[in-house]
Every structure is written in C-alpha cells, then in structure tokens.
C-alpha cells in the first residue's frame, strides 16, 4: 500500500471563514479522502459532504485551478492544489 500524497487545500470565501485558515495540507489519494480530511481538521466545515460522500451544492472544488470536480473517486497527485470555494450566486 503506497503512502497518501500530500495535497494543499486552499479555502476561499465562506469556506475560509468557516475553516479559520487560508489553507491546509492533507494526505489523500482521492477527492473523497480529501473532503473527509478537511472535515476532520476543520470542524467549521462539518457538513461539507452529503450522506453519499459527495460535496454539497454549497461548495465547489477545483484541482489546480483548471477544472471543477465533483467525482469523489477522482485521484489527486502529490503537490496538487485543490481550491474549495463557495458556490454562491453572484449578482
């Protein structure tokens, strides 16, 4: 079994306020593991995931700022930066 890669999660908007920090390093192989680690490390973000493990509609995830992701099975690589944003409607 290989070690989990270290991934940096950057928080923006409401997630930053709820996390109480700008970023967090987590060990995760998939987006699902990453979300679980974020909820564990940042109690203010409890409820980030739906009962089926997917991200709630209140948040968006972007890997390396290039693509938005929703598949919790998607793998992450060592050194990836994953952005967690509010999915607020703008005006």
Residue ranges of model-derived segments:
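Ubiquitin-like/PB1-type beta-grasp interaction modules and other compact soluble beta-rich domains
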Residues: 1-90
């Amino acid at each position: 079994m290989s070690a989990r890669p270290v991934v940096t999660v950057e928080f923006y908007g409401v997630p930053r306020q709820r996390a109480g920090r700008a970023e967090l390093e987590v060990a995760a192989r998939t987006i699902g593991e990453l979300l679980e680690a974020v909820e564990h490390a940042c109690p203010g973000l409890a409820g980030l995931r739906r009962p089926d493990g997917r991200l709630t509609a209140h948040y968006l995830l972007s890997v390396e700022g290039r693509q938005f992701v929703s598949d919790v099975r998607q793998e992450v690589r060592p050194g990836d930066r994953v952005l967690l944003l509010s999915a607020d409607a703008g005006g």
